[in-house]
């Protein structure tokens, strides 16, 4: 008789081979228009420091950075489809945002974990195959507002170095 743990391991290996899920290990897999060489913690902070621009894009895919110097304002745009980290190439669309020009109430602090609270929101905007399906928030000006009820809430997020929702990557 095969122990239950052994069966679980076999089924989980088979499942991972057949799964269409994308393992999110970097914000670069989720957003266009990010500055080069940001850590995931910085990406998560930037997400929180941004707001939905419902006047120019009612799909909910576009967020604008807030409280930066005029030359450093930009948009974060959800990808149509999540991509594997290996698929991101030199042709990726980067911007040149300077985080030091932010003049909002809570500037970036490297000691703070900005990712724990937002990954559930990111999970809710993509379906199981990694396709964008709906906006995170309805008519919200805050990127961290309560999300719309999810249609699919089981995007696989795994392999985190600290047991939390996101891990730092080398990008």
Curated annotation (Swiss-Prot):
Disruption phenotype: Leads to elevated levels of Ty1 retrotransposition and Ty1 cDNA. It is found in: Cytoplasm; Secreted. One of its GO terms (cellular component) is extracellular region. It comes from the Eukaryota. Its main location: cytoplasm. Keywords: Cytoplasm, Glycoprotein, Secreted, Signal. Glycans are attached at residues 37, 139, 159. Residues 1-20 form the signal peptide. This is Secreted protein CSS3. The lineage of its organism: Eukaryota, Fungi, Dikarya, Ascomycota, Saccharomycotina.
